[in-house]
Amino acid sequence: VASEMKSIESYCEKLQEFPPGNYYKNGEFTQWYQPNWANEIPTDAVSLPKLKKALEDSVHKQLMCDVPYGVLISGGLDSSVIAAIAAKYSKKRVESGDAEEAWWPRLHSFAIGLEGSPDLKAAKIVADAIGTVHHECKYTIQEGLDALRDVIYHLETYDVTTIRAATPMYLMARKIKSMGIKMVLSGEGADEVFGGYLYFHMAPNKEELHHETVRKLQKLSKYDCLRANKSMAAWGIEARVPFLGKEFLEYAMNIDPADKMCSDGKAEKYVLRKAFEGLIPDEVLWRQKEQFSDGVGYNWIDSLKANADEKVSDDNLANAKRKFPIQPPTTKEGYYYREIFDEMYPTNEAARSEEHTSELQSHLNL
């Protein structure tokens, strides 16, 4: 058992992820975490005060920390709400039952983007409103391209969407590390819990919406949580995610999914937005969901595609199945990342261990 594939990849005949919510004993995995909501359709009507308190309690619990900590603000709803709650509790030490003054009197917040990116603008609005010491991490396209190999090495994946979003996060972690911050709170998980992705507008009924939120949650360790965890851990920083706290999930995932439906013109994550109305500025509270890799600057994705077009020929892509018989790439960008991955992790087991679910297909199914 190892925390990273790179330490055992060349020694093992078979590789597999240690599944979340399991323990390992006598040569087999046993699932200890089996919540009712994973197999049943909840029927509890949402209570906005209870939802608000559940998330506040989750953030408060995650602030138990004896090292300097900060918050990540992407400029979207999720991270902004987490940051605002953290700011509320940051003046006292959680370890003392909020009786003692905090060792670090000011909460630091961090955002990253290309010059002029929408995320930087929105994050600054939130930081000013909640009173954090805010740090904008601006990067260039070339800096991002130069970091791709390191990102793939640390994340141990060739998933295109994950690499796109992880690269700016990796660069931001380097800046955070240089300031002595050891732990950060991040906003991953809210989209999965509340049906926050735009395709959830297509959910035909509450049952299908709930099934999809459960599926997304169960895949988080391979995608968003992998990105947040390993991008930060590469620089010795711990990322904590209050939206995925066990106690919070017990409440939020037992909400009747009818209350999460994007019906009657309601925005996605409507109940979350309503629960925290007044905590952050309305222009961010009601801001529409963007992919992290889009929000950091729209030129970022175009530049990644253009870079791959230069590196990978049409013939390369046409013969991808021959070179990569296990989960062959279907785009030049995917081909480029797969080449880098295979240089670092050349065994078939390494390639096979990276499960790549077609999100497009899941959207079509929904």
Q: What spans do the regions from the language model cover?
A:
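Active-site catalytic pocket residues across diverse enzymes, especially alpha/beta-hydrolases
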Residues: 86-90, 201, 256
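Short catalytic/ligand-binding loop motif for oxyanion handling, primarily in non-cytosolic enzymes
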Residues: 80-82, 143, 192-196, 201, ...
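Conserved acidic
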Residues: 43-47, 51, 160, 164, ...
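Cysteine-centered catalytic environments shared across enzyme families
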Residues: 1-158, 283
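Short amphipathic alpha-helical face segments that pack within enzyme cores
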Residues: 50, 54, 81-85, 122-125, ...
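Phosphate/ATP-binding catalytic cores across multiple sugar-kinase/actin-like superfamilies
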Residues: 49-71, 174-181, 340-352
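Adenosyl-5′-phosphate
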Residues: 178-185, 204, 209-358, 362
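Short acidic/histidine-rich active-site segments
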Residues: 181-191, 197
